[in-house]
Amino acid sequence: MQKIVLLVLSSLLVFNSFAQEISKEKEKQMQWFEDAKLGIFIHWGIYSVNGIDESWSFFNDYISHEDYMKQLDGFTASNYNAAEWAKLIAGSGAKYSVITTKHHDGVALWDTKCNDLSVVKKSPAGRDLIEPFVKELRKNDVKVGLYYSLLDWSHPDYPNETRKIKRYTDDSERWNRFVDFNFCQLEELSKQFKPDLYWFDGDWEQSAEKWKAKELAESLRGWNKNVILNSRIQGYGDYATPEQGLPITRPDNRYWELCMTMNDSWGYQHNDHNYKTPNQVIRILIDCINKGGNLLLDIGPKADGTIPAEQVTILKELGRWTNKHAEAIYGTRSGIPFEHYYGPTALNKKGDILYLYVPHKPNGPLVLKGIKNKINRMWVVGNGTKLNWDVKMKQYWSAVPGIVYIDVPEKVLDEQVTVIAILLDGKVDLYREKGQVIESN
């Protein structure tokens, strides 16, 4: 009996040790992503010709599939300049970029050999549009992400054609051909471009078993050991991907990313002028940073490959702000609870520098509460101006920290969002109790 107990204990120790090693390996693999904070999403495809919803327009019967595909004839990419795109993206402060290699319409933007439906073979663009972009991103030290739709409403072996029409309901031979097709395209992308990240979409229509999600994830990591996968592969991904709506509380997954459009459309739509302001975009980025996540901000180029002027303006102002405040963005971790400061915050990795984001012109001193640490220094991020502070309500007999009042001169304010850095005497130590009554004087 004693031998059995020892054997079980030793097996548990080995298992725990193995699990810890896997956890450390995952942490190391995900570090660049957790540090990045900002990525740029690109939805580019034939839907930009008419300026209609990508893929969904024919799936929802707003336009026939035949008329949707006629857009291939107008997709020229005649002014596409991958170097300019990459330079603009790097200049925005983004550390990675994700481009649609194929949306739900099945039209590939690279020279796939797995079928004939690509802009290379079927449109005036007539060339691989992914290859030059990947090269230019790497020249600019920007990580490469590839978007890939698992479902394909144009493929003859995919079950669903539109919301109302199915090609078939149960045909294992056709389904297996389609799964093989997905594996074929993803092997091409993996071996040709060696992406740092895959951004899957469309997994909701089938189960993990039908997609062969486990085998697919293993294959992708076999072709490219360190590739990161998003969550949309039926539970086999590395990070969560809330969409459009800003999370009010932090997602459960340690690693997460909000994907969001600049206006109301993923792809280029000439009638959509409802753009967010640079200030709104910056504040959403800050909210993501505050909760320990990333922002993947979308742009939608035109059919000729030019990026709309409104989108360029937003990216450039975003770049000005991120460049100025880099220390309070990249490599930071989630901030302190709102009870301590009425605004978003972040911490450096060591946890001894607290960043306060100031989105408005203060009408008095900033207020910081419940910090048990000694404050060594305060400064304005981006210009280095040292700040004065005052502590009130600190009693010698009480463990409750005093309230810190911080004076921020108007001359140091950024036109979008100001950031204050506070150097503490060690890792941030928060008072989270309910106050104290005097017992002795």
Protein language model annotation of sequence segments:
Residues 1-22:
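Bacterial Sec-dependent N-terminal signal peptides
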Residues 20-441:
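Mature catalytic domains of secreted/periplasmic carbohydrate-active enzymes
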